[in-house]
Amino acid sequence: ARRDSDFSVIIAVAVTPDNNIYVLDYVRKQSIPVLGIPGESKLGIVDYMFQYAKSYKPSLFTVEDTTMSKPIFQTLKSEMRRRNDFSIGYKEEKPGTRMSKRDRIQEILAQRFSIGQIHLKKTQYDLHREITTFGPRMAHDDTIDALAYAVKFANPPLAAGKDKEGNWYKKKPKARDWV
């Protein structure tokens, strides 16, 4: 892999009922194949998607729809059939040409960071570095770009409410009289 080639990033975020976003985990690798080789420890993008689906049960995977990502969609569909696992919901998102990548990232993330709505682990070094060096001269913006896509489509859970003390709880459906 060339030193300056882009990274593939798969990121998992959680959203609380009060719309705080927590970065749970991410994979950031250069020259990652679309699908790993069975029997070897090297996983591909689609393998990581199945792994994250099992671990985090995301409601949606957002995949940047570019010429380079077309094989991901084809492989994901065939792997779903092969594994008989259709638990992965995904959205193909075109980057758009209305604004630059840097402006798009800033539009999505800047306000949320400024009000303290996005929370990272101290051990997420690559993401911390990309956030603190964000700008026209930064070497890589792949992790922060993945975070922007995740945040753009992340919504708080719908079935949540607050009790009298202000604690969040999951609302339970009430039984109805059908007679």
Residue ranges: model-predicted function:
Residues 1-91, 117-179:
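RNase H-like, metal-dependent nuclease domains and their acidic two-metal-ion catalytic environment used
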Residues 40-42, 97-99, 110:
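A short linear-motif detector with a strong N-terminal bias
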Residues 84-105:
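Conserved phosphate-binding/catalytic loops in two-lobed NTP-binding clefts
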Residues 98-100, 108, 166-172:
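General helical secondary-structure elements
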Residues 101-115, 133-137:
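Short, surface-exposed amphipathic charged segments that create phosphate/polyanion-binding patches used
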